[in-house]
Structures are given as structure tokens and as C-alpha cells.
Amino acid sequence: MSIQLGQWFATLVPILVLLVLLLHCKWGGDEAASAGLLFSLLIAYVVFGGGIDMIALAVAKGMWYSLSIVLVVFPALIIYEVSRESGAFAVIREGMQRFTPDKVLQVLAVGWIFVGFLQGITGFGVPVVVGAPLLIGMGVKPLTAVLITLLGQAWGNTFGTLGLAWDGLISQVDLSDSLTMSRAIIWTTAMLGIVNLIAGLLIAGLAGGARGVKRNAVTVILLGLLQGAGQMGIALLNPMLCNFIVASLSLGLIFVIGRLDYYRQPVELFDPAEEKAGNTTVGSKMNIQQAFMPYLFLIVIAVVVLLNDSIKNYLGQWKLSFAFAGKSTILGFETHSYSAYAPLAPLTHSGAFLLLAGIVGYICYLQWGYIQAGGMKRILKNSLNKTIPSAIAVIGLTAMSKVMDETGQTTVLAQGVAAVTGGIYPLLSPFIGLLGTFMTSSNLSSNILFGSFQQKVALMLQIDKVPLLAAQTVGGAIGSIIAPSKILLGTTTAGILGQEGLVISKVLGGALLLCAIFGAVIFASYQFGW
């Protein structure tokens, strides 16, 4: 038991090192991730008995998996730099003023509704890398823009990306009975609806302060109820499309709301960014449709490809992958052998859509005369300079996650929590999902990692598994707010790389509190037989 306890404490070390360096020492994400990786390697070898070959393969898997994230960062920065170079952001700000002079509603429209829409169809950090620069272009401070997009995308991390994370969960557990499946959907969507409603109110507060919350409370509650109830109802019929459909309806509805007399009076942001001189001479000739053109093209290409199975399957048949042998530690933790590990389909990857949108945007702006001489050189230079440190951090984080997973550290950490807590485990069940997403930056990966574990705990405690499974994926969705790799995407595109610790410090307490509340609700459901 003492050895097991020592193993459990050892699993905490890489996570604690990462958090302390980010939050207390104010290290950048690349430095903190490298240190966390180093400690995970040492513990894998010394405590868990992983061989050099096994650990090396785990690092290689992490590096390969990180490529799918880096392939989102660079093209997203291309779009941002193209829009900045052309002066499109100045036009977007002016166009949003015509939509409504209420800047708080503008932020809600982009940072809550539009970001949620992007999560519904794309995911993989795209809502953050697209939404943050748009908000900055509208006058929001970079740090605030990152916080807003992290909040806005959270609720869509289970049924967004065409239900990918939900599919990951049900692939690991037994929800074959239709009644059990329906109960799981109701539990999950009810909690996600609350997450979304709270996020909307917080975004109103970040944009407009206490007055922003008070002035927009009715609008946020109505839209939140529409999204929450709509997602629940549609998910019972089609989990794949439920988030995308309600997000699309909400996107149309908020533009109708913006035309109401109530929102025709000017309202300023609570703490706006300072105005900066930009390419306003060129941008002033541009119309709002041209300014949004790269983003509109991104939406169209993503919808056409991802919602059309014939196109998606045709383009998705070309995949890149590596084969990896299975290994085991001295303690008996085994990894699977893969003939094709984590296949990357480049033509249906979010990065391909972003890159294509950036290229089309550049060509159009160049033809329209909005790109100055030397524009391409500046765009590529700025994009590469921002991508490199972000890529180092992402590689470090994903390699650390994979080393901990494959050498048994993550499993021991979760099992230790369940063994120690026993009957009060339901209180902590959302935190397991949160931990999985924090470690992997993906609710899909979290559900695959811990979905069956939650089911086994329910069996061990002889309790209903449905609330625990809902807690798993809802906790994972909340975890997307504090996921280091996702935060890195935001700080990179917002131009505040190195402030990842500050971002985490702003959202960590709220994420933990929300998980604690849901944990209490789930615990109460067992006590009172809900």
C-alpha cells in the first residue's frame, strides 16, 4: 500500500510542476511544458518502470498527436495576419457598430454565439484562434478576448464538432439500452445548458461589467434556455447535429435581437483596449462582407465538407499515420500496438480549412488592392514568429500527457482518487473529466481515457452509471476552459504568448467551482434517488 501511495503522489508531480511554474513563477507555456515533460519522464522511468524504448515511443506519439494542433495554429495566424494587413479588423469594428451600437451585445454575438457556432462544426481550438482576434479587432483587450472565447466554446465540447466527444464516450461504455442512452443525454445536456448560461453571463460581465450583466441578463437567459433546451431535444433525436443546429439558430436570432430598439443606443465596453492606428486608409474602402470574407469562406467550406458524407469520406480517405509497437512497464501497464496510430486526414483537417480560407482571403484582398507591397513577407514572418514558441509548448504538453497515460501515471492518479473517496466519489466525478481534458486538451481524449473508468467505479459502488458518465463529459467540457494547449492557441493568436499562467489563474477557480457544484448535484441525486 505504501508503494501504491508513493506512486499516487508521484503522479501528481508533473501536474503540480506545470501549475506552479505557470501560476506562481509566471513561466511561459513552452518553458513550463518542457519542465513538466522532464518530470513525467523521470517518474515514468524511476517509479513506474517504463523502459527507455517505451518512453521514447510515448514521446513520439505525443509529438505526432501535437502536429494536429500545430496545424491549426499556423493557418489561423495566417488568417489573422491577412485580416490585419488588409485593414479588415477596422471594417469589422465599424460593421458591428451598424449591427448594434451596443458593444457588449457585439461581444456576446461574437464571443458567445459565433464562437459556439464554430465549436459546433469545427472544434480543435478553431473557435479560440478565430474568435480572439475578431474580438481584439472590435476593441476588446487581448487577455479578455482569450478569456471570453474559452468560456464561449466550453459548452460545445461534448456535442460540438458534430458530436465527436460524445461518440468517444459511448464507444467506451455500455449505453445500448435506449432508455439509458436518453437518460445520459438528458443529464449531460442539462448540465451543459447551465455551463452555457453561466458562460453567457460571465462574458456579458467581462465585456460590460456589472451593468453589462444587468442590461443583457434577459437576452442571455433567453438565448441560453433556447440553446440548452434545443440541444437536449435535438440530441435525443440526433446527437451529431444538435449543437450545430441550435448554434446556427442562435446566430440568426441574436442578429434579430440586435435590431430591437433596446439595443439601438450606444453602450461602451467596461474596459476597452486602447485604439491603435491601423491600415484604416485601405480598410475604409472595404465593405463588411469583404472584411468577413475569410471567415465566411471558412464556415462554408467546413459545412460543405463536414456535413456531406460523400465529400467528407472521399477527401478523408487519404491519411497519414505511423505504426507503433505495444510495450509494457515493469508494473504491468501495457500499451496497444498500432498499425496506424492517430491517422491524420490532411484534406478534412481543420487546419486545411483555415489555410485555404487564409489563402483565398489573401488572394482576394490582393486583387481588391487592400494588401500593401511586401504584405506576404510580413504575413508569413509574423505568423512563423508566433507559431514556433507555441509549437514548442504544445509538443511538450502532448508528450507529457502521452508519457503519463502510457506508463500508467494517469490511471493510477484516477484510481487513487476513487479508492480513497469511496462512497463520496460522485462528488469528485466531474473532476476526473476535467483532469482528462486538462491533460490532453481534448474532451474526446478525456472520454476515451476515463469513460470506461467511470463506468467501472459505478459498478464497484453499485450505483447508477448514468450520472457519472454525464459528469465525465461535462467535466471534460469545463476542462476545455483551462486546457493549456487551448489556452496557448488563444494567447498565440491574441499576441500575448507567455501569459498562459495569467489566463489559467483567471479561470481555474471558476472551473473548479463549477465542477464542485455539479459534483454536489450528482452526489445528491444518489442520496435522494433522483
Q: Where are each of the predicted segments found?
A:
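Juxtamembrane and boundary regions of transmembrane helices in multi-pass small-molecule transporters
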Residues: T158-P272, V474-W530
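Active-site loops and adjacent core secondary-structure elements that bind or stabilize anionic groups
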Residues: M232-W318
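Re-entrant/interfacial helical elements at transmembrane boundaries that shape
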Residues: V126-I136, L150, G163-L175, L444-V457, ...
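Membrane-embedded alpha-helical segments and adjacent helix-loop junctions characteristic
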Residues: A56-M138, L147, Y370-V457
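Alpha-helical transmembrane segments of multi-pass membrane proteins
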Residues: V104-G116, K141-W155, T180-L197, A393-G396, ...
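Transmembrane helical segments that form the transport core of multi-pass membrane transport proteins
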Residues: T281-I432
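Structural signature of hydrophobic alpha-helical transmembrane segments
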Residues: S2-V13, S66-I69, T122-P127, M181-L197, ...
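Hydrophobic mid-bilayer segments of alpha-helices in multi-pass membrane transport proteins
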Residues: A10-L19, W27-F48, V70-A76, V220-G224, ...
